[in-house]
A protein has these predicted regions:
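Conserved small/polar residues in nucleotide/adenosyl-binding loops
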Residues: 181-188
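Substrate-recognition/cap regions that form aromatic- and gly/pro-loop-enriched pockets
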Residues: 97, 101-178
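Midchain, well-structured core segments that form catalytic/ion-binding scaffolds
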Residues: 1-117
Length: 189
């Protein structure tokens, strides 16, 4: 399995090689096509160019055991991915999120990279702890790097009032709020 490319980017593609007994190949292909239709329908508005395909490999891939495959899938399903919490103070602002940005299974080694962002430090730590616990319970070694402090926006700051007024004078309309969050990276092996 090879999905995503960078820990600070939403994955855009993934490939996976699986071993299937010849007697089950027709059923696996049919189920793949069924799931592909479901996924494409679910994401048609936000990812209209999603492409999912199945093809036969030129050679037999090196495989991991079924039990390890199930452990990996179950653990990935437990790891927060996407919006974790919206801001209770600023409408429409994502307060915290996590991106499972990279998953790689190669040479019998499982590696993931994820990135947590939050304007609230304790919430970022909560997401990081949840991810750590999920992967450590599977027996993985978890390394946390690239921690940046959370920064909670102050919608009532003096500079914001001045900048809003200046924007209104220049453009004769109200500005739209924009905020950035800070990051914590995870690598799991």
């Amino acid at each position: 399995f090879d999905g995503g490319g960078l820990r600070n980017a939403i994955p855009r593609e993934a490939t996976c090689a699986i071993a299937v007994p010849a007697t089950k190949l027709t059923n696996v292909k049919a189920e793949f096509e069924n799931q592909a239709r479901i996924i494409q329908n679910e994401y048609k508005s936000i990812e209209p160019n999603t492409h999912l395909k199945i093809s036969e490999a030129d050679k037999m891939p090196k495989v991991i055991s079924e039990s390890d495959t199930i452990k990996i899938i179950n653990t990935l399903c437990c790891a927060p991915n996407g919006v974790y919490r919206m801001s209770p103070d600023i409408a429409g602002l994502v307060e915290a999120s996590s991106s499972l940005a990279r998953v790689l299974i190669k040479n019998n080694k499982f590696t993931t990279q994820s990135l947590q962002r939050s304007s609230v430090e304790s919430t970022k730590d909560e997401i990081a702890m949840t991810i750590r616990c999920a992967f450590e319970s599977m027996g993985c070694e978890v390394t946390q790097t690239g921690d940046y402090p959370g920064w909670q926006p102050n919608p009532n700051s003096d500079i914001l009032v001045v900048m809003e007024q200046l924007y209104k004078e220049l453009y004769n309309e109200n500005p739209q709020a924009v905020s950035y969050t800070h990051l914590r990276a995870h690598e799991t092996r």
